Amino acid sequence: MKKRRQGPINKRVDFLSNKVNKYSIRKFTVGTASILVGATLMFGAADNEAKAAEDNQLESASKEEQKGSRDNENSKLNQVDLDNGSHSSEKTTNVNNATEVKKVEAPTTSDVSKPKANEAVVTNESTKPKTTEAPTVNEESIAETPKTSTTQQDSTEKNNPSLKDNLNSSSTTSKESKTDEHSTKQAQMSTNKSNLDTNDSPTQSEKTSSQANNDSTDNQSAPSKQLDSKPSEQKVYKTKFNDEPTQDVEHTTTKLKTPSVSTDSSVNDKQDYTRSAVASLGVDSNETEAITNAVRDNLDLKAASREQINEAIIAEALKKDFSNPDYGVDTPLALNRSQSKNSPHKSASPRMNLMSLAAEPNSGKNVNDKVKITNPTLSLNKSNNHANNVIWPTSNEQFNLKANYELDDSIKEGDTFTIKYGQYIRPGGLELPAIKTQLRSKDGSIVANGVYDKTTNTTTYTFTNYVDQYQNITGSFDLIATPKRETAIKDNQNYPMEVTIANEVVKKDFIVDYGNKKDNTTTAAVANVDNVNNKHNEVVYLNQNNQNPKYAKYFSTVKNGEFIPGEVKVYEVTDTNAMVDSFNPDLNSSNVKDVTSQFAPKVSADGTRVDINFARSMANGKKYIVTQAVRPTGTGNVYTEYWLTRDGTTNTNDFYRGTKSTTVTYLNGSSTAQGDNPTYSLGDYVWLDKNKNGVQDDDEKGLAGVYVTLKDSNNRELQRVTTDQSGHYQFDNLQNGTYTVEFAIPDNYTPSPANNSTNDAIDSDGERDGTRKVVVAKGTINNADNMTVDTGFYLTPKYNVGDYVWEDTNKDGIQDDNEKGISGVKVTLKNKNGDTIGTTTTDSNGKYEFTGLENGDYTIEFETPEGYTPTKQNSGSDEGKDSNGTKTTVTVKDADNKTIDSGFYKPTYNLGDYVWEDTNKDGIQDDSEKGISGVKVTLKDKNGNAIGTTTTDASGHYQFKGLENGSYTVEFETPSGYTPTKANSGQDITVDSNGITTTGIINGADNLTIDSGFYKTPKYSVGDYVWEDTNKDGIQDDNEKGISGVKVTLKDEKGNIISTTTTDENGKYQFDNLDSGNYIIHFEKPEGMTQTTANSGNDDEKDADGEDVRVTITDHDDFSIDNGYFDDDSDSDSDADSDSDSDSDSDADSDSDADSDSDADSDSDSDSDSDADSDSDSDSDSDSDSDSDADSDSDSDSDSDADSDSDSDSDSDSDSDSDSDSDSDSDSDSDSDSDSDSDSDSDSDADSDSDADSDSDSDSDSDADSDSDSDSDSDADSDSDSDSDSDSDSDSDADSDSDSDSDSDSDSDSDSDSDSDSDSDSDADSDSDSDSDSDSDSDSDSDSDSDSDSDSDADSDADSDSDADSDSDADSDSDSDSDSDADSDSDSDSDSDSDSDSDSDSDSDSDSDSDSDSDSDADSDSDSDSDSDSDSDSDADSDSDSDSDSDADSDSDSDSDSDADSDSDSDSDSDADSDSDSDSDSDSDSDSDADSDSDSDSDSDSDSDSDSDSDSDSDSDSDSDSDSDSDSDSDSDSDSDSDSDSDSDSDSDSDSDSDSDSDSDSDSDSDSDSDSDSDSDSDSDSDSDSDSDSDSDSDSDSDSDSDSDSDSDSDSDSDSDSDSDADSDSDSDSDSDADSDSDSDSDSDSDSDSDSDSDSDSDSDSDSDSDSDSDSDSDSDSDSDSDSDSDKNAKDKLPDTGANEDHDSKGTLLGTLFAGLGALLLGRRRKKDNKEK
């Protein structure tokens, strides 16, 4: 808000003697809104006492206007009723102490927890007179104690902004915040003053805290404008100057060196240091010894530190040097100072040269321990008739805080001391405390700047450079304080008032009485006076006495002021505790409610009246608080009345009323609070005027550490600062007027010419003031800042002489660019009389310089460095480049002379030349031949002693320097891989090779002809081929192929191994980088193979050389060393009765053509309870295009509890067209924990012919990890009747790490005709990439009943890239009861493109994982009746042609109990665009508990309409923890022909991990009746052409209870385009607790009518890359008993079945290799009839 203006102060603002030892404070008109800010701080006592001078003192009397005395008012107001109320106004007379203004010191920034009250410490404001108005209402301002008479006692301010907008709205002016910035900057500046500075400028701390000014209202009702705070702030510079660099003040000191000392130095060294330091200060020479002796006499030099010596020097130098009135203090200070008889004190002058010493120690420290406080007292300034220990704060009563102090002489500029106020007391009176204060001496000099911090309730004083000029400083102060209304809130309560001055505590108890008349209808008080914003904040309590008027109107009037619109607020009191006695209500608490808008206070046009119509609001007992703000408008007392009547008038005849009035009175009534006047800043810049033109140029920097003093028009010092690092200074809080600015002239500097430019902002304004060591400039402030008062100094001219001492390598006496300086050369400077005046040595660059020379003639002498000879002198015409010899004369004339240089040379020579690569081996350097770097060259003297070594540089050059005449030997070390070329081949010694050892002669000149050439030593290779000699003739035939992986060892002729390798996939091997010589090559025979005949042919490159071959290399490669092997034959007749449980993991890549005609009748009943905990990491990129047509009718009852957190990013493109009709009932309980770690790298090539007739009954548990490359022809005729019922409860913990690199090539033709009646449970987890043309005609009737309880925790890391295009028609009728517990953590990145067209009617439970690469022709005719439980994990890559005719009748009842614990991490990025239209009628009852923690980044949109009532009860007893880490690199190529007739009864448990590339022709005719429960996990990549005609009638009952806890992290990138038509009729009752985070984008058309009575538990993980042509017509009823007698010629090592290690028995279970049926864990079969929701 706008400040009230006041013109310049034309009266003197000093003290007039009033009576002995007292000073009355002159009163100034500061405006009616001002309040007595506080008494000024004074020093000393009586005439010798330095007192804080307060410029403006306003005394306000606080009056309580009331018709009677306090007691009378009580009774009277209690009797008032609304009908005939009486108006009473209490007046409090002005307090006498207002006349005698106490020096108010702003409390320091110490730690008082209270809010920052803005203390207006009177002491500080020299510029602005402090007004001492203490508005009677409670005013918290520290310095002033204006007296206001208020009917009600002042309301205290609470810690929180209790008076909210009205009381807290005031804020400090922007100028103050600006001050704050400057304060911090000044602090910075002061620390960087030149060497002389004491580090902290006086205003430093003041600036730092100045921001507190801005929140003066923080916890107080309203911030008060501090009358003196602005002047007290001394800004050293403006913010804009922060970035400017600091001028180095070292220029002000002489160049003479001062010895360095420490505490341990000797007394003599310390005395020398003292003498040198004193001399460097520029003290008069006749005083130097006196100061040095004084330091010696007054200090114990033996124990003294450098810091103590510096302090002693400063003290003594001050005594000697500060004798001229540089600061306008023409008489000794009124402070008590010790007068040294040797150095009487006169006025002080600044010393730039002292700053280096003064700045060293104690910069900016708290010196409370060095401020001695005596006679501290806390007394009551009583102005009313009451007990002496009672204070009436609202009647303008305050505390007086007095003390004397004495400053230790070690205190320096920037040091601080504090005054900390206790919990219940704060500085100031009714006014809000001023933030800025000053301590002044009697003559007006600023001793310290104070800053009050409301948050800590502390004033911190920062000493100015005043303390550096004087010693034995003593003083006293008298401060005003008041109870802190935020904490001392109750009337008639005893509070301890405590203040800590420096380290001295003064404490006294007082009873506080605010005079809150609780029996009055209207009670009011001035809460505080805010000088910053020029307003009085008033608080009114209404209906505090429960008068409950039926109709009431409130109005208030003011004289000599006006109400501020918008600052009248009404609060409804919800708790009477809000009406605190201190009149400092917390308006932010829940005890009050802002209802201003409800009553809409009205302010009159002239601002002198406020009206609020409460109507009937008080009739029910409501109480209200009104806050209002008054801005003084005149020079008289501000008088406010507060009325509560029935009609809003003062008519006393008809209505009773409640009234109250307050008056803020000012002594003399003519002054205005200084804080209301606008203030400005004055300042600018002191700079180093290098070009002495009196104008600031861009490259000229500021001078730090220059003392600047501000004086008023009466020559009274107002403020003083020191320029900051960038040379800036600033004085703040100045009113309009003309001021004098004095700049102390730094030593060794001269003032620049004044007013040399028309631009006043950049010229120099200072002019020397006679003989005084200051320059003076005038600055005028006229309603704006004046930032143009600046001055320049330049260094008093001194000149330099010097230049350069260099090594004149070419001895021409001229400095060349490549010639370098010589360091350490002694140079002597003599005057014209020949006296030595300086010596120096050249630096590392050969430079030297003598500085600080006056005009005159000098002689410079150069000492010849050892080993050098002076070069020619004055050889050139360029004086700056020639040599002046060892002695020369120089004349200095108003300029530096940098031409005096001297050259020397060493009489030594160089030897060297070049080492090159002689590519054409002719011993002559050709232009195209390049140097060889890094060749070691050794130099020896004539006695053969090595005197130097070096290596050739990047270009092949080398050189030895500094050699005297003589004969030398040069030896060149042959570089690795090189051979020396011919020596001395040509006539030109500069281009021929001198060989590896040669002699070089130096005779008065360099010899740069010694060179040597080398050429690269040739390297050769040996190797060839290891092949399979199928016809065993020892000769490589074109159709015979290489054998990979054969180990080949290279040895030297002594048999030491040099290297080993293995043949590549083609059987090739090679050893490189061999020198000529004899070698041995050894071939290690591959397992299962026999060495072929050696050296059987005439062609060495075609025959076999045997296993150990001796080879001689002579200047050429040898690629004829090869060897051949052929396969062993085995004939085995085995009779095996096997009970095997097989778990096979195969990887098959099959290209099959299948034409199948199957007739299947299956009845399966499966009860599956699966608990899967899978953590998978898969990176799949799938592109699937699916077009599906689903007609499903499902009846499911599901109770699922799923907690899934999935983050999947899938990009899938699927087109599926499916038509399925399935009826399945599955109950699966599986618990598998597998942790396998397999690293297999096998390469086997087996050619076996086996004719096996075996009758085997085997109970085997096999774990096979095989990599087989088999080429077999088998003809098998098997009749097997196997009835296997496996109830397996497996707990497998496999930790496998798989890194597989497989090459599979399969080509298969399959023709099968099958007629099957199967009752199967299939759990299939398949990942298929199929490109199939299938024409299938199948007739299948399946009824499957499966009870599977699976608990799987899978940890798989899969990276799949699949393309699937599926078109499926699905008609499914399922009734599923599933209870699954799956914990899967998958991270999959899949990009799949699948196009599948399948028509399936299946009730299967299959879990197959197959990876197979087979090329087989199978013709099998089998009749089997098998009841098998198979868990097959196969990964098949097969290219098979199969013609099978099978008739299968299978009845399978599977109860599998598997617990799989898999941890998979899948990274899948899927983009699914699915368009589904689903009509589903499903009835599902499922009870699933799924805890799935998957991290999937999926972008999917799913639109699904399902009604599922599924009750799945899963009995899962399986524990599976699978962590697989497998590193398999297999390359298998198998061609097998197998004819087998087997009769086998097998119960097998096999865990097989096979990677097979088989090319087999199999003709099998099987008739099988199988009751199979197959759990197959297959990974197949199949490209199949299938022509199948199938008729499938499937009736399946599926009761599945799955509990799935899945933690998957999948990042899948799939493009899915799914167009599905689903007709589904589902009835679902699901109780699911699902916490799923999924984002799916699916556009599906599904028309599904599924009533699925299908008990199928299908967990299929298949990765199939199959290209198959399958024509299958199978009718199988098989119970086979197989007796096989096999004779095999196997190329590859067969899988290790765990039987034994004999290689001859490894071909027995060829069928087991492909089956891979593993560890299907069977549990109890359970079907739940009662559905569980």
From Swiss-Prot:
Propeptide: 1698-1733
InterPro entries: Adhesion_dom_sf, Fibrogen-bd_dom1, Ig-like_fold, LPXTG_anchor, SDr-like, Sdr_B, SDR_Ig, YSIRK_signal_dom
Signal peptide residues on this chain, from the entry's feature table: 1-45
Region span, Disordered: 51-269, 332-351, 862-890, 1085-1708
Location of this chain's protein in the cell: Secreted, Cell wall
Modified positions (Pentaglycyl murein peptidoglycan amidated threonine) in chain numbering: 1697
Acidic residues compositional bias, start-end: 1125-1684
Predominant localisation class: secreted
Keywords linked to the UniProt accession: Cell wall, Peptidoglycan-anchor, Repeat, Secreted, Signal, Virulence
PANTHER family from the UniProt entry: TOL-PAL SYSTEM PROTEIN TOLA (PTHR34403:SF8)
Protein known as: Serine-aspartate repeat-containing protein F
Gene giving rise to this polypeptide: sdrF
